[in-house]
Every structure is written in C-alpha cells, then in structure tokens.
Amino acid sequence: MNLNEDSLRKIAELSRLNIRPKEKEATLRDFNKILEYVDQVKGLDVSSIRDDEIYFRHENSIRPDLVGQHLSREEIEKFAPSFQNGYFVVPKVIET
C-alpha cells in the first residue's frame, strides 16, 4: 500500500500534524517505508508459534512501600541550585 499526498494530508489533519511543504516529500516517503514494513510483518507465517509463547512471564517487580528516614525540606534546599516556595526551579523546556 502506498500513500499519496491526499492521504497524507488527511492523516495530518486527523492527527493534528503540521507538515510543512518542504517536509511533505520526506514524510510521505517515511510513511510509505513504514507501510512496507507492516506489509512484510503481515506476510510472516506465525502458524507454528503457540499462543502461550507470545506472552511474557513476568513477576511484579514493584518494591513494597516502606516508611523510613527522609531528608527535610531544608536539607533538600541545600542541594538544589534554585528552590522557591517549596519547589525546585528549573529552566523552561516547553514553550507555549
């Protein structure tokens, strides 16, 4: 299956992606590579794999909550480069 520009535009609109005109060709190429890979995976013969082989056997590895010693707010403030009103002050990383 190959996507065309119209399909890409519809997908971008539905997923609220803003694809710039100069990125359109590369994005379309990337989507088509992904779809080619999906087609390859769909074509694999998995009839010899038992259903119980698919699931991972994994035990719950969450540690129990234990109340213990902890640092006071004053001790934590000593380690922080910037601390204000009970919170760590960090550089802004997401612009709105």
Curated annotation (Swiss-Prot):
Matches recorded under HAMAP family: GatC
Entry function: Allows the formation of correctly charged Asn-tRNA(Asn) or Gln-tRNA(Gln) through the transamidation of misacylated Asp-tRNA(Asn) or Glu-tRNA(Gln) in organisms which lack either or both of asparaginyl-tRNA or glutaminyl-tRNA synthetases. The reaction takes place in the presence of glutamine and ATP through an activated phospho-Asp-tRNA(Asn) or phospho-Glu-tRNA(Gln).
Biological classification of the source: Bacteria, Pseudomonadati, Spirochaetota, Spirochaetia, Leptospirales
Keywords associated with the record: ATP-binding, Ligase, Nucleotide-binding, Protein biosynthesis
GO molecular-function term, one example from the UniProt record: ATP binding
Enzyme superclass (EC): ligase
Reactions accelerated catalytically: L-glutamyl-tRNA(Gln) + L-glutamine + ATP + H2O = L-glutaminyl-tRNA(Gln) + L-glutamate + ADP + phosphate + H(+); L-aspartyl-tRNA(Asn) + L-glutamine + ATP + H2O = L-asparaginyl-tRNA(Asn) + L-glutamate + ADP + phosphate + 2 H(+)
Family: Belongs to the GatC family.
Gene Ontology biological-process entries: glutaminyl-tRNAGln biosynthesis via transamidation; regulation of translational fidelity; translation
Descriptive protein name: Aspartyl/glutamyl-tRNA(Asn/Gln) amidotransferase subunit C
Organism name: Leptospira borgpetersenii serovar Hardjo-bovis (strain JB197)
InterPro entries xref list: Asp/Glu-ADT_sf_sub_c, GatC
EC number: 6.3.5.-
Pfam assignment, any one: GatC
Quaternary structure and partners: Heterotrimer of A, B and C subunits.
Record-linked PANTHER family: GLUTAMYL-TRNA(GLN) AMIDOTRANSFERASE SUBUNIT C, MITOCHONDRIAL (PTHR15004:SF0)
Superkingdom to which the source organism belongs: Bacteria
Gene: gatC
Membrane spanning residue stretches: none
